[in-house]
């Protein structure tokens, strides 16, 4: 005979008991370690009482209610941490922020200036600072100056105590590199992608070994529109004139390089050979979508999921067509940002 299914009343009682037991343990630890005082525990408890008293909703729709409860709990712990962060450190000083780097090239000698990119710079700086990163900003650099800035940043002693870093690039670019301020067709001024990865790999930047290294690039990668037109009768597709496929570029040395280049993820604003759009007043579409989805989901989703949500927002082509791509992914674990923790 099959086991009898518990009634809703029994399930509700079980949920309430589990919540109470779980939270009692958390609050005891917070009090014993002087992280939260009695008033702060009481304040959090008032909000969590709502969750316990509505355990029926947990049974009926556990996913939705768990998200609400998690958001309430996270916000209170985040506010408490900001208020008490100076007391948690043993020497009375605030915790050191994790270093992040943002390189923006707006003004060029031969290429057109990237008007509107200041909004991208301010938006990303605000986002990363809210995620706990101390952002170093460098502007209007040649390729050699960008490489020097990267090597100096890789040598920061703060990386020893950090758990990750962000590298954000905003510039013109070619297929596999970021353009410096002196770039033109007759005399390229390019910081190649391989150079960036080489500077921060485990051989040359051991303080970031086994730590996520997130690279975000807002830049065109060619002149193509990145679309094909399909006819409804024959189903044949015709590509734009710049849409030539890249062939023969698959390497077979991944096993050899796996322990050298590890824990990277690069998120680029468009597919190879194609453009990336930027509004002179509102900034780039790619950066604005990153900021939106990070703010919405970084507390609950891992980094790849957030990047995929950004990609999904570009899935249907419209007037301004581009598709961000995740590249050179070598992280072996999911990376959760958990702002406030």
From Swiss-Prot:
Pfam families per UniProt: CARD (PF00619), Peptidase_C14 (PF00656)
A GO biological-process term: positive regulation of inflammatory response
GO molecular function term, any single one: cysteine-type peptidase activity
Record-linked InterPro entries: CARD, Caspase-like_dom_sf, Caspase_cys_AS, DEATH-like_dom_sf, Pept_C14, Pept_C14_caspase, Pept_C14_p10, Pept_C14_p20
Domain of life: Eukaryota
Family assignment from sequence similarity: Belongs to the peptidase C14A family.
The protein, known as: Inactive caspase-12
Lineage, highest ranks first: Eukaryota, Metazoa, Chordata, Craniata, Vertebrata
Gene coding for it: CASP12
């Amino acid at each position: 005979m099959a086991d009898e299914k518990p009634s809703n009343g029994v399930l509700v009682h079980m949920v309430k008991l589990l919540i109470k037991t779980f939270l009692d343990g958390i609050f005891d630890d917070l009090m014993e370690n002087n992280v939260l005082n009695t008033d702060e525990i009481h304040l959090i408890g008032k909000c969590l009482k709502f969750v316990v008293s509505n355990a029926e909703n947990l049974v009926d729709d556990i996913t939705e209610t768990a998200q609400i409860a998690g958001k309430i709990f996270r916000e209170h712990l985040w506010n408490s941490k900001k208020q008490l962060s100076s007391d948690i450190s043993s020497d009375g000083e605030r915790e050191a922020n994790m270093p992040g780097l943002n390189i923006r090239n707006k003004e060029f000698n031969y290429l057109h200036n990237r008007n509107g990119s200041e909004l991208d710079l301010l938006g990303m700086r605000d986002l990363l600072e809210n995620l706990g990163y101390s952002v170093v900003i460098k502007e209007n650099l040649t390729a050699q100056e960008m490489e020097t800035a990267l090597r100096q940043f890789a040598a920061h002693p703060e990386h020893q105590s950090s758990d990750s870093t962000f590298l954000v690039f905003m510039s013109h670019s070619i297929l596999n590199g970021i353009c410096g301020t002196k770039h033109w067709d007759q005399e390229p001024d390019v910081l190649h992608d391989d150079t960036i990865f080489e500077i921060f790999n485990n051989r040359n930047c051991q303080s970031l070994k086994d730590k996520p290294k997130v690279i975000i690039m807002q830049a065109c990668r060619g002149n193509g529109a990145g679309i094909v037109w399909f006819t409804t009768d024959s189903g044949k597709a015709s590509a734009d004139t710049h849409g030539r496929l890249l062939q023969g570029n698959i390497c077979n040395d991944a096993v050899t390089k796996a322990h050298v280049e590890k824990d990277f993820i690069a998120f680029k604003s468009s597919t190879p050979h194609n453009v990336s759009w930027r509004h002179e007043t509102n900034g780039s579409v790619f950066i604005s979508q990153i900021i939106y989805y990070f703010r919405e989901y970084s507390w609950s989703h891992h980094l790849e999921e957030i990047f995929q949500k950004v990609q999904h927002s570009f899935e249907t082509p419209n007037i301004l067509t581009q598709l961000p791509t995740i590249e050179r992914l070598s992280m072996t674990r999911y990376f959760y940002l958990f702002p406030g923790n």
